[in-house]
């Protein structure tokens, strides 16, 4: 895959990144030994979906319009983007950032990350918070060209907004266990390995010992749409690519991507 991440340090303990990736997995290039203390990350998803790792190989799935606040003393080994497409804004800061002179006003206000870190355990999801989304989106205009002073002010606005509204509580609707993630990923890989195969959801669900409804729920949670919708979209994408790069007939390409009847392919 391809893409780019622009990372800029507004201060020693705060960096801002704009992310635009067309890939599913991006390795972390920072040496874990370089990370000191507890680091807090706020991810704002604008397009695609991203995974935020949780204990036990589980994950929170961040979809467009969501912000995920997470804390960790260890960096993950990689970032994962289930749809192979992601665009977003990332703030990463140390729990000691407010000790820097630029953020003295936060200390005067008695701001502390201690209670946040206890509540995160290790992540929470803000869904549909338009004000927070607008604040996060505004960083795009501050990084090109980079405006460090205004970025620091905007960062403090973000912190004060989160402090005022409080961290989300209750059931995590976008939380998926290790088992859920394994089922969704295995199903995805099985489908994409041979788009021409005639798959039956009942057979796939039975192989995991779950219902078709559960299979679709897990898959949709990670990839955004139910299995049939995802498979149809991937088949059409592959067919469009083949039409561009080969001289094969529509009927031949239709069969290669799982449409034995060309008329059904045209209708799709």
Language-model-derived ranges and their functions:
Residues 128-138, 171-199, 205-207, 232-248:
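A short, Lys/Arg-enriched amphipathic alpha-helix from helix-turn-helix/homeodomain DNA-binding modules
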Residues 248-249, 264:
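Residue-level recognition of oxygen-bearing side chains
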């Amino acid at each position: 895959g391809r893409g780019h991440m622009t990372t800029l340090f507004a201060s020693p303990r705060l960096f801002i990144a704009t992310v635009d990736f067309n890939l599913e997995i991006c390795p972390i290039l920072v040496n874990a030994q370089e990370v000191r203390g507890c680091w807090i990350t706020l991810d704002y998803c604008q397009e695609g979906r991203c995974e935020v790792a949780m204990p036990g190989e589980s994950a929170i799935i961040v979809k467009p319009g969501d912000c995920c606040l997470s804390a960790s003393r260890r960096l993950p080994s990689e970032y994962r983007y289930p749809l192979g497409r992601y665009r977003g804004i990332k703030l990463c800061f140390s729990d000691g950032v407010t000790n820097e002179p630029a953020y003295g006003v936060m200390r005067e206000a008695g701001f502390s990350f201690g209670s946040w870190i206890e509540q995160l355990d290790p992540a929470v999801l803000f869904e549909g918070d338009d004000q927070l989304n607008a604040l996060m989106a505004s960083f795009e205009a501050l990084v090109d060209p980079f405006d460090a002073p205004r970025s620091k002010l905007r960062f403090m606005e973000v912190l004060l907004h989160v402090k005022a509204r409080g961290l989300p509580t209750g059931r995590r609707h976008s939380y998926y266990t290790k088992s859920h993630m394994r089922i969704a990923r295995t199903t995805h890989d099985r489908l994409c390995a041979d788009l021409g195969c005639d798959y039956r959801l009942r057979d796939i669900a039975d192989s995991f010992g779950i219902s078709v409804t559960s299979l679709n729920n897990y898959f949709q949670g990670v990839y955004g749409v139910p299995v049939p919708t995802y498979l149809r979209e991937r088949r059409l994408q592959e067919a469009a690519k083949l039409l561009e790069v080969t001289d094969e007939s529509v009927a031949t390409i239709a069969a290669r991507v799982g449409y034995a009847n060309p008329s059904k392919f045209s209708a799709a």
